[in-house]
Amino acid sequence: MKSLLVSIVAAVVLVGCKSISIHKAAFDGNIEAVKQHLDAGAEVDAKDDKFVGTFLHWAAAGGQDEIVELLIAAGADVNATDGDGDTPLHLAGNNTATKVIAELLIAKGADVNAMNLSPPGREIGGMTPLDMATLGNRTEIANLIRKHGGKTGAELKAEGN
């Protein structure tokens, strides 16, 4: 009975904190807050209400190596998609992410050729993590993705994918 009460209190606290604060902790590198939420029973792949991204999306976008590693160890889905169809590897191509994050995601099976949702008016289709890294001038990450078989959206479309 006591453990049920503790679980209910933890759930109420988490709901009262709003999911965005949990995700923001992942983005900001607040590893203790992320651990507390996970220890209290937060679903590792819970999505926020605004961008529909998981903790892992936010940690990757924020360049938080330790939190990415923690979340992967906790069973986070490295191929989860957010509201734009981006995976955490798509976000690893931004200007705050590190090569370590891309390496961790790829080592755990991130799809290097995942395509996000096509923006309106684009004829070539969605963008891959390689496209995102290239646009972000993240040559080291782009080379890593390419080394693991990553292609651009245009290359995939030319192949009929």
Predicted stretch roles:
Residues 24-30, 58-64, 91-98, 123-127, ...:
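Ankyrin repeat A-helix N-terminal signature
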Residues 119-161:
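Leucine-rich solenoid repeat scaffolds
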